[in-house]
């Protein structure tokens, strides 16, 4: 699989944007992000983008850990930074969509592009300039960038590479029929955002990023996902206690609905384990019992197994994690499949819980 074909890379722009660059407002929705928000905001304030054409708006969604105080302190030092506190969350809308929608209603009047960025993102100085230049040049209405993932814990390193491979394969299999975006970075033309009703139109969606991209595409707007590996990084989770609920809350939407998610899960498990089990069974049949069919099948089985391991070795190198994690990929897909089952269960029979809130 050619990663650049599935997720084309956005290379850093070498051009210099002038004071005639489009006005961009970056909206950062936050809820209990005291450990992340300062580093995120500082990286945004260091952008190589004309100061008069850039604003940063942090929307605090009823944080209880001092997040708003940190942002307020930074805002006193930087005129481009503003803090907006949300009122109590109304029924029928998720906290993130509520924060994003209120933020979009509070941007400067001359804002041409809205850029929604998660608090766990760290931005290279060239991020906004490169993204805006690409969006303008290619006449995009939504440009989403997948960040370079900072994987530190065992759970992150085991599961996230397998999950991203699965997402890439499902995107390739759909042949562009469905839309895929990466929630940590969404650059949206303001005119297009307002034309479809923005986050208010997808307020009840758990995976609001995917829902918004779909509605934009349905209305004829141009949506594109790129790899932003050289322009932004993110550590979305910190271990099992955040990986499981964080992924389970939106896997159903990300994989195209309950039926599609279940099919993906039930295909992934046998395929992953087949890389080890089939060569082992063929070797046993050939060497122990002398079965000619098993001996004939052993070489292609070993070749297929080597290809699967090689793919995940390349993935481990890409994610900058120890290569031995590549040998554990059947465990990663199995854990991911269990998360899919949990995601479907939550969606059909229970409530999705995230950051102290429950959504029907």
PLM regions with names:
Residues 66, 117-134:
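Acidic donor-binding/catalytic loop of UDP-sugar-dependent glycosyltransferases
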Residues 6, 79-107, 130-196, 200, ...:
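Long helical/loop segments within the catalytic core of UDP-sugar-dependent glycosyltransferases
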Residues 135-166, 191-194, 199-261, 359:
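Catalytic donor/gating beta->alpha subdomain of glycosyltransferases that bind UDP-sugars
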Residues 22-25, 55:
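Cell-envelope/extracellular polymer assembly enzymes that use nucleotide-activated donors
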Residues 42-53:
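Short, acidic, metal-binding catalytic loop of nucleotide-sugar glycosyltransferases
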Residues 60-70, 87-88:
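A conserved acidic beta->alpha catalytic loop
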Residues 33-36, 63, 124:
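Donor nucleotide-sugar binding loop of glycosyltransferases
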Residues 262-349:
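Membrane-embedded multi-pass helical conduit in multi-pass membrane proteins
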């Amino acid at each position: 699989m050619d990663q650049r074909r599935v997720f084309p890379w956005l290379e850093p722009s070498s051009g210099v944007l002038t004071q005639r660059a489009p006005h961009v407002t970056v909206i950062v929705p936050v809820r209990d992000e005291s450990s992340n928000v300062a580093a995120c905001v500082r990286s945004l304030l260091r952008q190589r983008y004309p100061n008069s054409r850039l604003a940063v708006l942090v929307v605090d969604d009823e944080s209880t850990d001092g997040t708003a105080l940190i942002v307020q302190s930074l805002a006193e030092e930087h005129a481009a930074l503003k803090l907006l506190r949300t009122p109590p969350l109304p029924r029928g809308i998720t906290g993130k969509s509520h924060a994003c929608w209120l933020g979009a209603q509070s941007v400067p009047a001359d804002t041409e592009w809205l850029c929604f960025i998660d608090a766990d993102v760290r931005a290279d100085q060239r991020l906004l300039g490169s993204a805006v230049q690409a969006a303008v040049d290619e006449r995009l209405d939504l440009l989403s960038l997948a960040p370079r993932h900072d994987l530190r814990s065992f759970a992150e390193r085991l599961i996230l590479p397998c999950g991203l491979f699965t997402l890439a394969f499902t995107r390739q299999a759909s042949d562009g029929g469905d839309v895929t975006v990466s929630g940590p970075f969404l650059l949206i033309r303001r005119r297009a955002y307002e034309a479809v009703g923005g986050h208010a139109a997808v307020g009840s969606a758990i995976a609001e990023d995917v829902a918004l991209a779909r509605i934009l595409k349905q209305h004829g707007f141009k949506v594109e996902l790129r790899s932003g590996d050289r322009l932004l990084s993110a550590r979305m989770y910190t271990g099992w206690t955040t990986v499981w609920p964080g992924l389970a809350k939106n896997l159903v939407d990300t994989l195209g609905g309950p039926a599609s998610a279940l099919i993906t899960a039930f295909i992934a498990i046998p395929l992953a384990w087949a890389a080890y089990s089939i060569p082992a069974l063929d070797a046993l049949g050939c060497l122990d019992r002398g079965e000619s069919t098993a001996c004939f099948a052993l070489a292609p089985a070993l070749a297929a197994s080597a290809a699967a391991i090689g793919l995940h070795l390349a993935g481990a190198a890409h994610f900058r994690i120890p290569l031995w994690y590549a040998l554990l990929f059947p465990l990663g897909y199995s854990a991911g499949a269990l998360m899919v089952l949990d995601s479907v269960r939550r969606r059909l029979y229970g409530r999705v819980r995230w950051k102290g809130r429950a959504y029907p």
